[in-house]
Amino acid sequence: MSAGVSGSYPVQTVKKMDGDEKFYGLGDKTGFLNKRDYEYENWNSDIPQAHTDSYRALYKSIPFLITLKKESVYGIFFDNTYRSYVNLGKENQAYFYYGADAGNLDYYFIAGDTMPDIVGGYTYLTGRTPLPQLWTLGYHQSRWGYDSADCIKKVAGKYRELDIPCDTMHFDIDYMDGYRVFTWNEKDYGDPAGTIQELADEGFKAVCIIDPGVKLDPGYEKYDEGIAGDYFAKTPEGEVYVNAVWPGDSVYPDFGQPKVRKCGQKIRSS
């Protein structure tokens, strides 16, 4: 089956694809719910342009597929943490394939009679999230570009005016001071407690997003704390890893370290 497959990867598996086969899953990806005829890359990326079908990677990479046919359904979980690739018939309608840059070819075939059976088998392998609070399952309004608290409150008010159910308003990175995590832009967003209380009075929860990058900015409390505590990810040479995101040059907490996870939990609960 591998003959003629253009994706020649160190780790690869090719599967026969039936004519009625549909594909779902893979996490945060462009395109329709049915991923047939698409190709994707499992490599988390923050693309600032419009998310058209041509983008193969977005924010999340979940190498888990649910395959639905007229008479059957099954799942495949590819257990590989390296940069990987999925082609679901875009190259050829006779097959689909998965490839990775390195690692082992480990994958799980999950059988069942229904989609919920497949999801149950997948979460049995990977772990299950506790049942969240009810409001988290409602409608959430989230977008980049609300440049002030007044803008967010205006949108929230419109939901109530039009009697459209909405449980939560999200604050994107504009609420931060210079895109520094765990800060607040008081100039445009005012008093945080007051702003959030105004939304609560109208029945909204507020969610303030947190980005993974910490601005490389000596004198900025979270940066200085991370350097002093040796909290940030490093290169193979032992230097703190630096790459640019929204604040410019940034460093990244190494959540593989227990002390970093503990620090993160403490900050979020304060």
Residue ranges and their predicted role:
Residues 130-270:
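Aromatic-lined carbohydrate-binding/catalytic grooves of carbohydrate-active enzymes
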